[in-house]
Every structure is written in structure tokens, then in C-alpha cells.
């Protein structure tokens, strides 16, 4: 009708409708606008008035909500859920149908700033929601008329339900069936945790008629004024653990009288009417249901075990709710896997029915804000995986550094984000971030006080690219003007959203002027809320949907600085930005560019950039680095090159087979292998090298040849060594043609002999070439060869004696001729005339001597005269000469004899006669330096331990006149000790000062004040035994094998110095740094004699389980016995500090070792290392390896540690770090009284400041050194019991062969001394000289029982005979340290037994000074043994 009359006059009804609109609608709209403005002003007043109240903490949740209650700032909310489609048909009528999934909240009981807006948030969050993923909190609803119908569709809550301060009279959850209780609510004052908790509410009824199951947690009701019917509910039917509900009512007024349940209700009810009767599916079941659910009372009416809250039938499809997972109307224990095994093909294949586990639901695809990992929807990837396209995939190499988010950013946690790429969680910057605050723990105890955060420290976020949760900014500070430190942030995933307004990016009431997050490309989930920022510009012009992933994501940007004021202030986008807006001022802050984008900066044209080109209509890109100008991508589009051009490409340098010719690459000569020019030689402008080259005699290259060419005539082929460093270095590893020897025309190597020279330049003589034939040769010009002439010829024309030109001796003419002729050549040469021509004729000078048949005239007389003259002349010369020589010799000998007699007379008269002959030992002088320091230079700290004659302190050495502090350990000799202890003290200093090695504890100095002190390096990390026990999970194979190698190196050094340690164990190896260990305890080390390889001890405790059998039986100690102890020490390391033979008594060890007992193979130890350890435990000492061999073996192991030790997680083990700050703290503790201005120095750097730099294992020692086992107890307390692993004074029976001995053995398997004191021991102690001279009987002890003669225990005693009171002893006749008797007799050592010393105790086995210093006495009837 309206269409037919559209051109005619308006009908009357339409006029009335228009009038009604003018009268009613417009005033209503105006009133609504006025109400909105008034409400807005009221809201600002409420926010300002409630700023302090925002921090109000309810007593059960104060610690969890200290970040400011004003977080609930929302002014509006849009629902943000995940809809999961279902394939159920309507005819199934199954109640378990998932629809919309909503995210729960975590704000507990925090008070909202605006309760009306709080109600709107709840309404928008849960409208049409059927599945709450998290907690459902219904709080602070004081208006009893509020509509709660938005709760009608909720069927399942995965967390807990909290109802607090709700005044609505009736709260109804008509379809709620199950509360899973995966997260529970708890009051801090009580231990109970609740899945349903109702408190301080004035509602009359809480109606949940379909609630069937609470899988975890309890139910509680606390101080509810009017709530009825809750006490009638049979909670054991609902709560899975079967407990009853918790009720508490503390008000003075009595509880409200509640109406009775409907008559149709068999037990309890939720409210009035039959629909609120409690339903039962557990208490009414048959016993055959085994405590599960049922759908009837009969035995066969039990629900499936996967059902929760009851069922309608016996199968998995009949469940009302699922206990584990819901998969298309079927309850399952697990979701269908994404991959399944194919038994036919034996491979894993993709499962077409596979689904992901999301909460208690199986879904085909995970929600957009979650990640896929191993068939589950997760919020973050595990440590070894990274997010790639919404799926967790293994990292290719190191994973991007991921840091956990924080509830509030403050000065205490900001440094944890340094170098982070991904923040797994949320970032919140609040007012207290910049003002500081006092932390309060969940148990209401005071936490740390955080200082205000300097805004400059926020630069740590410059490396962050992703935030998996949300970013919340609510802080103000004068310097907090922008978010430029998030300039590299690319994605906010929003896997966790703020409870108010579902915000992923929320900036409220901040002091920001601009955002400047120029690289933010996407907000995957959640809304954008930017409100009440009075100085913030630019945000209103940003097109937020361009960076939001889903269209339903909301944006609230309002009540910031007005656009006209921003424009007035000039805080507007650049003219190069398009309508999408910008993050701040500048052309690099645009979301998109109006013209062109060049590396994130907007420009008007690509021509403004010299080395850029137009990639497309919107993008400029930089030219290739080798292009100075270009017209496209790649080095082949260059218009001008930066370096050189090779064909169509610009390159940084010419390829190997080309050279640079004024910016263009030209081909090298064909024979070159790389070049700088066109020539075919080697040098500038020629080849760099070539495969084959002809060289001159001066080793310069004449020209290059091709690889397959042959050397020309006159040259030979020669290989150039790869290490060549001379003029032929460019040809190293290649070949050259070297010129033959000048005497050789054709050759195969340099030389002129037949083996290398095939043709001579001039002549050949035998096997070598000659320039010309020698005089004793003749020349064959045709063959150009020299032949040897006849021996009797002087010049010849042939090889025979008849070819001579002249003779060496005599000519022999033909016998038929009557006489020689001057020009006759018919003769032979001979060395001796024949009998028939035995006469030599010298008459003809031109002919020379020749053989003749008859003598010449007067030849006989002439011959006789010549012989006589020779004898006369010879005799006349020789006889006088001999006589003169004899006379001179006699006179010299007489003078020498007189001079000796004069010297002897002079020495006798002057008293300088030396009757003692020299006995040179050929041993060099010990020139090691021993530094002496003053007592005032030392600052002692706490006691590290005690020994038999001293204490060990940690301390600091401050050298006088120098501004330096050195951490040291100070060993101080007690004043109560005697002279013998002082001697032993100095002997230890002598040994430690004489030996210097990187793996031996270094003696720094000695203090000779009233109390003698040794100053050594301070080992900050204690002994290696404790270190491996305390850091077992952090020690890898590399560290273990490095320590083993270092111990072997230190012991190899002692072996070279002929020192026997005697007590090598892990407890006597100290740790300076995690990479450096040092062997300690030289107090028991003994120097071997130069003519002996063993040392025999007469007393002292012995670590039985660390010693070789010969040590236990005969007390014989050698370097090979140290090898046995080394094997046990390495076994301790590989077992991380286990005790050897822990369950075997020490008294049984000798017998068991003799029958083949060995330590078992450690779990992490390979067979290679264990075989090495077994070689150290050979019963025959000669079969054991040396320490030099062990050093080589373990160094080889350390090069491939993973091959020889199998430690779980080896690659992830990291030893504890040791920082310079720890060093400074230690110095502050050790020397608190110093002014602190001194610099900290390493002991090695201080003592050797000019050492050449090089690799060194020395590091700073700045930590406290644990107690050394060597100094365990106060030696003055002789009755004390140690009670530890190092000592045990109880005696034990030890077996040696078939002999059983009752010997004292301590708990650490140390064999106690067996010698007993003589009856006059006390007197001898008071008079050592008398004791030394007296003969003391040998007491019956261990050494006597086994029949081994007692040996010299202290050879160094002979060095100090006067000190020890042996004044009458003859001077030793051998080297220092080698005890030798001065007469024909022998020597016997008689040692007193322990017990005669009143101060002796079990812990003195390291400092057994009385036994070690016993004087030696001579006995002519005994034999010397060393």
C-alpha cells in the first residue's frame, strides 16, 4: 500500500508516528546522553575516591592482590569465547553439549572500583557460556534486583566457583552439572581447599538442581545471612572424596528459618518446589557399582567408569558428564592420538580421527590463542621447543631465550628479562613499579622491600619479540613517556587475558605521550583497551583491526588527550603515514606508508636513498652490498660496483682465476692458479701460485707450466714441502722444475752422478760427470768419457803400460834393442826392474831412469856415498836435540815439586790444613726462593682447621708498602709445641717451597715471628671429595677427566722430583676453581734417596683402603704405591665421592687384596678407563704404569670425554660459576678492618708480575676454603673422639698372609702406628742428647712380627745432627737425603711405640713428628736399609 501511494500525500498515521518520535525519542536520546556524561563524571570521582580502596585486600587474598584493586578498571566488556561445534543430533538429547567456552578469572576477592561496570563485565563474560575454562567468581553484587540469567547455560566449570558479597535473593545455576576443581580456592587461615565456596552473601537460595559431581575439593559456606536449604543437601553424593560441607555462621542474630523442601523430595533440596529436589546417582547405587555412579538401583545399572555426575545408560555415550575427556558425546580416558601405529607397515601414520586435548574436551583444532604440542592445546612450549605457526616444534640449535612473565614489574625482577626473545606470560607496569613497595607473602609474612625502578632500566625489553599473555601499563612517572623499549615487539598472543575487558593490550591512567611500538604486527587474541591517559596522542588514529587477528576482538580507545590538543602540540603523525595511523612522531613510526617503505621508514621516493631501488609500488629496498647504484635486487642488477665487476655481477674481489684490472676482473694466464696480473711467472702482476713452475738457480720462478706438462730438458721435477717458508712458499705443496747440475745435461734429480744424471754436459768419469778428465785419465772424445790410465804411466794414450807417454818409475825398453833412444816410444813402464835387467840407469836425463842389463860406469860408488851421507847427517841432528829435551824436562819437574812442598808448608803453618776429602754429589744447589714476611702484613680470619702442632686460618696478606691484598691460608705453629715440631714445620716449608707446579699447592711465604706461620694459596672451593659430593648433578665427563689429568700431572712432577706423597686421596686434592685442582698435604711426603727408589716408614697412620699391599705389609712406599692410591682417587671421582670398600672391614682388606679384590667398575665408567684403573692395582708394583704414562692416557681420555664416561644429561651439566664479586666479598670478610682501598691480587700474579703472558690455570682464590681433613680437631684434647670419617681410635685385627695381628685401625681404614715407647721415654724427651746417645731396645711391634728390618725413616736427620743432639756422629759420606754410615758397621733404627707421648691422639697421623724425628743410632752388627 505504501508503495502504491508513495507519490501522494502522507497518510495521517505516518504523521502521528513522526510526531511521537519527535516528542518521545529525541528527549529520551538527550536524557541518555546527559546520563552518560553524568555517569562519566561520577566514574572519574569514584576512581579518584577509590584509589586507596583499590588496594584493599580481603584477609584470605591480601597477598595475592597487592597490585592494586584498580586493575578492574573496565568500562565495558564484550564476550570473548571459543565456540566448539558438535555433531550431536537433536534426537540424542544428550545434555553434555559443548557450546561456547569462556575463560574464567583469577582475581579472587578483589574489590572492583565500579560495581555497576563489574556487573556488566560478568554479564558479558558469561552470556551464552556453557563451559568455563577456569574459575567462576560471582562477587560484589550488592543490588538485589540484578538479573543473573546469564548463568543459565553454564554446565561445567573446570576450576572453582566463588560467591561472595552477593545480595541477589535467588542465585540459580539451572544447568550446572560438574565442578572439576582443577584449581581450588583456599582461605589463608585454613588448610581446606574449596571447589565451591559461598561467603558473606545475603541471598536466600542457591539453586543448583543439576549439580551431580565435584571431582576435586570441598564445599564451604561461611557467614551467609539468609542462605537456606544448604544443610539439607547430601554432599557426600556430590563431593567425590565423600566429605560433608563446611558450614560457619558467626553472626549474633539467629539464622533465618527456612521453608521445608517439597514433599516429593526424598532427602534434601536446593530450594522450594519439586524441581529443586536433590538427585542421586551414587548413594542409591548397588554395591556392585564399586562406589561409582549409576542410573538405577540394580546391580547392572552402573555407569561407565569414565562418567562423572551420573548417566542414563551403561555405555560411554550415556554419561551426563565426562570424568576425563569429552569427544563427540563419548566419554574417553584419552583423546584420539594424532598419530597411530600401523602394524602392517611398521610406521607411525597420521590418524584421521586424531584430536587435541583442550581442557576436558577433545577438539579437532586448538583455539587460536593456544599452541599445539603432542596432541594437546597448551599455553606455552616446553624448554626444548619453540612456537612456529601455532605449533611447538623442536628448536634448530639453541632455542630463543624464553623468560617467564611477572605479576608486577619491579626493580627486583627486571634484570631477569635481559636478552629475552619471548616472554611466556604477562608484563604489568603499575604505579608501584616506579614508587617501590613492600612485598607480602601469601602467609602474611613480610617479603623484600623493592626500591623504585629507574625508567632507564626498561631498555632490557628491547630484545623482546613476543609476549604470550598480555601487556598492561598503568604506571606514571615523569620519565615514563613512551614504550620505545618495546620497539622490537612483534606479537602479543593473548593466551592469557586480563579479567576485565579481556584485554591483551591495556594502557590505562599512564603518563605516556606515545606508544612507539613500531614493529607490533599482530595481537592474536583479546581486546585493546587504552583509556584515561591524559597526555597520550596518536592512539585514536591507529587502525587497530589491522593488527588484530580476529574480527570479534574489541577496541576501547577513549578519554585520552583530545585530538585537537594533540594537533595543537604538534604530536601528530608524519605526512608520510597513511590513514592507518602511527605509533609516534617520525617517519619510522607509521603503521603503513603513504608512498614507500624503506627498512621501516616511510619516504616519498626511492630516489632519496642513494643505494636503494624500487622493489614494488610500496617498498624500497637496499641494493646489493656490492652495488653502488642499482636498478634491482642482486649483484647482477648493479649499475655501478663498489669493488669490482666480474661479468654481469659485482663482487667484493675477483675469483681465484681472475685479477683486478681497474675494476674489471680479467682471466689469469692459463698456467696460473690465482693471479694479480697477466704474466705467467709468480709475483706482483703475475700468478699467485701454479701447479708446476720452472725455477732458476736462485729459486726464482722463470715461468709456470700447466699441471700435466713435463719439465723441459735440463730440468727435473721436484715436490715442494707444504711447510716451505722460503722464496718458494707460494708453491708449497706443489711441484717445480729445478735446473739440473751444471755438469749434467739430462737428469732426474740434482747431482752429477750416474743415478740422477743420464747425460753429462762435458765428460763422464766412471759414475759421475767431470768438466775435464783428470791427469791420471785419458779422454775418449767420441764417447766423451774419461778412462783410468795405467798405474805406472805419467800421461798416456791408452789403458796399457805400453801406451804411456812417460813413466812414474822405470822404463823398460825392448831387450832386442842395444840401447835407448831419446825419441823412442817403444817401451813399457814398470815399478820394478826384472832380474834380467835389474840395473837402473840414470845417465840420460831426457830418457829418464830405465832398466838395463848391465850397470853403468861408477854407479856403485855413487850409490854407497849417498847412503853414508844420509846416516851421518841424521845422527848429527837427532842426538843433541834429545839431550836438550831431557835436561829441560828434569828442571821443570824439580820446580813443580818445590812449589807443592812450599804450599803444604804454608798451609801447615797457617792452620788451614783440610784433612777431610771432598765428596761431590753432582746434585745442583736448591735455589728456590723462600719469602719471609712480617706478622703485621697478615690479617687472620676464621679458623679453617687444626693439626697436631698448629692451626690453619683463612686470611689476607697485605705486603708492606704495597697497595694490594692477597687471599691466603695461614698455618700457625702453636706456642706450646717443642723444637722438634718446629723442625718438622720448617721441613714442610722446605718441601713446599722446593716444589712448584700448577697442580701442587703453592707456598707463598713464611713468617718467622713469635709464632711461626706458613702462608699458602687459599683454595676457595675446598677439597675435591666434598666438591664432587655436593655438585654431583652439575659435574660432567669433561670436568672429571680434566681433574684426573691434572692430578696425574701433579703426581708426575713429584715422581720426577723423587717425592713419595704417601697419602694421595680425593680429600687431599683441593679445588681452586672448577677447572683447576691442586694436590696438597706435603707434610707426609718423603724425598727418595738418589740410589733408592723406595722409602720405608717406621710409624704413623696408614690409609689402608688407599694403599698397595706392599705398603700395608712392609711399610714400603714408592712412586708405584702412589699409583695405586691414584687409581683409588680416580675411582672416588667417578663414583662422586663414594668410599672405597665401604662395606668391608679394614682388617680384612689385606687378605682380600691378596686373593684378587678390586674396586668395582663405576656406573659411568667405560671399560677403557676401568682397565687403566686395574693396571694401577697390580699386586706387582713393577707392572703398574708410571705417572708420566698415566698423564698421557688421561689427557687422551679428556680429548673425547663423552666416549669414555657416560653421564646422563652430560651436555647440560654446568659447574657453579665463581664471580669477581664473590672474591670481593671474601676479602671484605677476611679483612674487615682495612680501609678497602687495596687492590685484590692473585698470588701468582703478585709473586711473578713480569711473567710472559700465556695459557695458565691459575685463577683468583676468593672464596672460603672448607675445612681440610688435615686439621680436624684440637690436638690438646687427647681424649676427644672425632666421630667422623677421618679417624677411629679403635684397634682392629689385621691379617697379613697367615699371620693375624691386633693392630689399631681407624674408621677411615688408616693403620695406626705400631711402635711402643721405651720405659725411659719421658726422660729421653727432656734430655734429647742423652736419648740420642743411649741405646734403646727395640719394642715388639708390627715390623718385628713380620720379620722386616726397621729402616731409616728420616734421612734428613743427618742434615741436622747438631740440632738433634747427635754431636758425635761421623760426617755422612753421601749426598743429602741418603743416610750412609761412616764406618764399616751398619745402623739400626730403634723407634719408641706410640703412647709414650702424652699429647698424642688419633688425629695426628698427618703430623707424627715424634716418630719422624727419632735419632738414628749405630750398631756394628746390623745392616743399613733405606
UniProtKB/Swiss-Prot annotation:
Topological domain (Extracellular) residues are 31-868
**What effect on the protein does mutating residue 346 to E have, as reported in its record?**
In dim-arm; Does not form dimers even in the presence of spitz
Tell me yes or no: is tRNA-binding among this UniProt entry's keywords.
no
As stated in the Swiss-Prot or TrEMBL entry, residues carrying the post-translational modification Phosphothreonine are 902
Q: Which residues form the active site?
A: 1063
Q: Which InterPro entries match?
A: Furin-like_Cys-rich_dom, Furin_repeat, GF_recep_IV, Growth_fac_rcpt_cys_sf, Kinase-like_dom_sf, Prot_kinase_dom, Protein_kinase_ATP_BS, Rcpt_L-dom
State which residue ranges cross the membrane: 869-889
One Gene Ontology cellular component annotation? plasma membrane
Q: In what way is this protein post-translationally modified? A: Ubiquitination by Cbl in response to high spi, promotes its interaction with Graf and thus facilitates its GPI-enriched endocytic compartment (GEEC) mediated endocytosis and its subsequent degradation.
An MF annotation (GO) of this entry: transmembrane receptor protein tyrosine kinase activity
Deleted gene: phenotype: Embryonic wound healing defects. RNAi-mediated knockdown in tracheal cells results in defective gas-filling lumen in terminal branches.
What happens when you mutate residue 1204 to F? Answer: Weak interaction with EGFRAP. Very weak interaction with EGFRAP
| The keyword Kinase appears for this protein | yes
Q: Where is the Protein kinase domain?
A: 938-1198
Catalysed reactions, as listed in the record: L-tyrosyl-[protein] + ATP = O-phospho-L-tyrosyl-[protein] + ADP + H(+)
So what family is this one in?
Belongs to the protein kinase superfamily. Tyr protein kinase family. EGF receptor subfamily.
UniProt function note: Receptor tyrosine kinase, binding ligands of the EGF family and activating several signaling cascades to convert extracellular cues into appropriate cellular responses. Known ligands include spitz, gurken, vein and giant-lens. Transduces the signal through the ras-raf-MAPK pathway. Critical for the proliferation of imaginal tissues, and for the determination of both the antero-posterior and dorso-ventral polarities of the oocyte.
Q: What is this protein called?
A: Epidermal growth factor receptor
Gene name of this polypeptide: Egfr
